[in-house]
Amino acid sequence: MGRSPCCEKAHTNKGAWTKEEDQRLVDYIRNHGEGCWRSLPKSAGLLRCGKSCRLRWINYLRPDLKRGNFTDDEDQIIIKLHSLLGNKWSLIAGRLPGRTDNEIKNYWNTHIKRKLLSHGIDPQTHRQINESKTVSSQVVVPIQNDAVEYSFSNLAVKPKTENSSDNGASTSGTTTDEDLRQNGECYYSDNSGHIKLNLDLTLGFGSWSGRIVGVGSSADSKPWCDPVMEARLSLL
């Protein structure tokens, strides 16, 4: 269940308070204290809401309230507390005896704000306006995902010098085409008798791909790559 209203709104006065209502409220609180604001209007003979009586007393009728304009010292205290607490007017009012939170808020919006702006200070950040614009205009530039290419070409593979008969390898002392095919290597040969390897490796930051391509100088030399190795590279 929701909280019941503090009064019957159909039988309460609204609008500006009259001098008679102010005096009746002051006399009752002086004699009986504040007490319960929900029952105070009926006890004081006022056709007002309890909340209206409380705000009227706190913001206007309290005897310890300060009257008149804010002093320069109060301005400095408000500015300093606002830089630390922000728009927490109740906490700021607790450091300024005799001033209400509503009064300080209105004074901030109508006077201090304009005063700070005239001096080139941002009332929200309490910094110079040019400095605030510089900080807010800084943009973090992400690293571009441009591919970085590394190319290795014309790499010569020296002939084997050790004889090997394992796994059906040639025993002639040199690396044969069949050996390279079994090892899954991509190659081409030229007229000099050397077996050359050409690698064109492309790397990227977001995703990378590698490909090994053989380019021959003669019409007979053709690039070849093991299908298993090619399938593995395509998955990367």
Swiss-Prot record:
Database matches in Pfam families: Myb_DNA-binding
Keywords per UniProt: DNA-binding, Nucleus, Repeat, Repressor, Transcription, Transcription regulation
PROSITE patterns per the UniProt record, alphabetical: HTH_MYB (PS51294)
Gene3D superfamilies from the UniProt entry: Homeodomain-like (1.10.10.60)
DNA-binding span(s): 37-61, 89-112
Extent of Polar residues compositional bias: 162-175
Nucleus as UniProt keyword: yes
Coiled-coil portions: none
Domain HTH myb-type: 9-61, 62-116
Keyword presence, Cell division: no
Major subcellular site: nucleus
Chain segments carrying region Disordered: 159-181
GO cellular component entries: nucleus
Induction text: By ethylene, asbscisic acid (ABA), auxin (IAA), and Pseudomonas syringae pv. phaseolica.
Tissue: Expressed in roots, stems, flower buds, and siliques.
Cellular localisation: Nucleus
Top-level taxon in the UniProt lineage: Eukaryota
Transmembrane parts of this sequence: none
Sample GO molecular function, one term: transcription cis-regulatory region binding
InterPro entries with a match to the protein in the record: Homeodomain-like_sf (IPR009057), Myb_dom (IPR017930), Myb_TF_plants (IPR015495), SANT/Myb (IPR001005)
CDD domains: SANT
PANTHER family named in the record: TRANSCRIPTION FACTOR MYB8-RELATED, TRANSCRIPTION FACTOR MYB8-RELATED-RELATED
Subunit structure: Interacts with BHLH012/MYC1 and BHLH042/TT8.
This protein's name: Transcription repressor MYB6
Species this protein is from: Arabidopsis thaliana (Mouse-ear cress)
Gene giving rise to this polypeptide: MYB6
